[in-house]
């Protein structure tokens, strides 16, 4: 009990300590945290029997959030693989207006579709990924096809070479984010996935944004040793629309800070199926992911991923069947990984991109700009996945 109290106390001290390094101190603390110890006692767990359990100073900030139940029909929710909005739980945080956290609202089995899409479909060309800078378009044309047999029969050993899917760190869809100029442009665009657009628009409508348009997405692929650096998503031209985040696979610690980095962040878990919305005041807050955590239920996948996707789906469903062969590949991947989809609207209604040419800027190769810290066996040592660090 003494060690636990001391650990919680140290987190509380860091969380309330102002100063230039307030965010970074907590980032380092949680990056080095040990699962199953008192290190994580101060992390808010919104999914803990829907009780928003936590013992740190952040737990006192948790409040219930109201959703717009009538804005999404049960039929449309079902088409996206979601429970009726009336059955969702939603939380906010005092001091963070516009922040909404929805613990796993997906129907049993329906997460399978979104995981498969991230690994099998969205990773294909013409979408853009981090491997494009190191390989030809032909080599990255179909990462799934090149990796599926390897993942299906892979052996758990640190010395084996990784498949291309395991080297994947980010994919962009819709308006493709330019990591060098930190801008979007009209001429760097491919059609946004219709199923992901539909899912995003239902969630946005339930949160009060019925006119939200899904125009750009950044998919992040985390290994257990990956991190996402402190940053703000500010490159979109319309900040009045929310940023949506969908998590699948292993859990992660998410840090939500303030407008400046000298404000200490609030720590929370993001589990498989959880959805997070940053809007209004919270749309431009600093945030980061310092730690991906192995499944606390033991080796393998979270329980919410055990139920299979129904073999027969409604004719108008945006969700497609997932074969057991495909899921075997997905499950093998997720045992040591997390996938996150972030969706945003880039332009306001009737808004166009600026006419001035977008100049390419030299890439900043400092550690600050790189977010994923991979292990020593990776051929792609570090991959930048956050827009505005």
Curated annotation (Swiss-Prot):
The record marks 133 as: Secondary catalytic residue forming the imine linkage with DNA. It comes from the Eukaryota. Changing residue 338 to A: Reduced Fe2OG dioxygenase activity. Abolishes ability to mediate oxidation of mt-tRNA(Met) methylated at cytosine(34) to form 5-formylcytosine (f(5)c). GO terms for molecular function: 2-oxoglutarate-dependent dioxygenase activity; broad specificity oxidative DNA demethylase activity; chemoattractant activity; class I DNA-(apurinic or apyrimidinic site) endonuclease activity; DNA N6-methyladenine demethylase activity; ferrous iron binding; oxidative RNA demethylase activity; tRNA binding. Ubiquitous. Changing residue 371 to A: Does not affect DNA lyase activity. It is found in: Nucleus; Mitochondrion. Keywords: Dioxygenase, DNA damage, DNA repair, Iron, Lyase, Metal-binding, Mitochondrion, Multifunctional enzyme, Nucleus, Oxidoreductase, RNA repair, Transcription, Transcription regulation, Translation regulation. Changing residue 137 to A: Does not affect DNA lyase activity. The record marks 133 as: Primary catalytic residue forming the imine linkage with DNA. Changing residue 134 to A: Does not affect DNA lyase activity. Residues 208-347 form the Fe2OG dioxygenase domain. Changing residue 133 to A: Reduced DNA lyase activity. Slightly more reduced DNA lyase activity. Strongly reduced activity. Binds 1 Fe(2+) ion per subunit. Changing residue 344 to A: Reduced Fe2OG dioxygenase activity. Changing residue 148 to A: Does not affect DNA lyase activity. Residues 86-389 are annotated as: tRNA-binding. Substrate binds at residues 144, 175-177, 233. 2-oxoglutarate binds at residues 220-222, 338-344. Its EC number is 1.14.11.-, 1.14.11.51, 4.2.99.18, 1.14.11.33. Dioxygenase that acts on nucleic acids, such as DNA and tRNA. Requires molecular oxygen, alpha-ketoglutarate and iron. A number of activities have been described for this dioxygenase, but recent results suggest that it mainly acts on tRNAs and mediates their demethylation or oxidation depending on the context and subcellular compartment. Mainly acts as a tRNA demethylase by removing N(1)-methyladenine from various tRNAs, with a preference for N(1)-methyladenine at position 58 (m1A58) present on a stem loop structure of tRNAs. Monomer. Interacts with DNAJB6. This is Nucleic acid dioxygenase ALKBH1. It comes from Homo sapiens.
